[in-house]
Amino acid sequence: MIPILLTATVNPQGMKGANFDVSERIEMYKDALKFYAEKGLKVVFAENSGFINLSQLHSDMSRMANRDSQSIKDCFDYKNMEFVDVSGPEYDQSRGKGYNETILLHKAVNASKFVQEAGCFFKITGRLKVLNIEKLLEEISKLSLSSSLSFAADCKDHKVYEWLHMPINGHVGECRYWFASVEFFETMMWPRYDELNDYPPNICLAEDLMLDVCRNTRGLPGCRDRFRTQARISGKGGHNLGKGWSFFYSTDNDSLALKVKCGLRQVLRWVMPWWKV
């Protein structure tokens, strides 16, 4: 079973642009953990701020299961949940989320028993719920049967907005969810962590780096930069984009605008899988 690796920062410690306070974040993480646990998936929860007792979180999850109906409680298998503390002096809020999350991933990949046993992982931003996660994992499993899959992600890489003279970036990697073998991550992604910085003057966002990885591996055996399945995500986004273009920049993944976009993109993945919109 491919383990889900949930990345978590309970306390961003004043990181510029980070949304939600500590109590809100904790509740979001608990909600996401419960969602994936109920599906019987293998889950690795990795936290890098050191602001929460992971043993206590585990106990809280147990109480949550006991409080719910028996049918829900029976879905929880705590043998399939692993809590990893990856806090340390490397955390640097002055570099932003991409830099710190990549360090988190490197430490978690090496510390997690589940990931080491599987040799791969499916990364998800820990506050979010990928509602059709089973479909994405099924797609990865099928690809792995036909070839040795080492990397699968999503990206936007088109010139539509440029043609329409719209001030929107049509070239960006998807960092909220992706799949990688341990070897791929350690050799193709981790060595570039020090390039990452969310702030001027040397901006390199995680989305920029992911797009570069997608482009560099496009067409290579075992690498995919487009899922056939459109991920359906629930939860609030952690960015401050705004710009008044709610259809393009909404931070609410449950909004009507993003649900419409999600539906349109699924159709395009079926009929024009080569068009990365």
Question: What is each residue range found by the language model?
Answer:
Residues 1-277:
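ER/Golgi luminal nucleotide-sugar-dependent glycosyltransferases, focusing on the catalytic module
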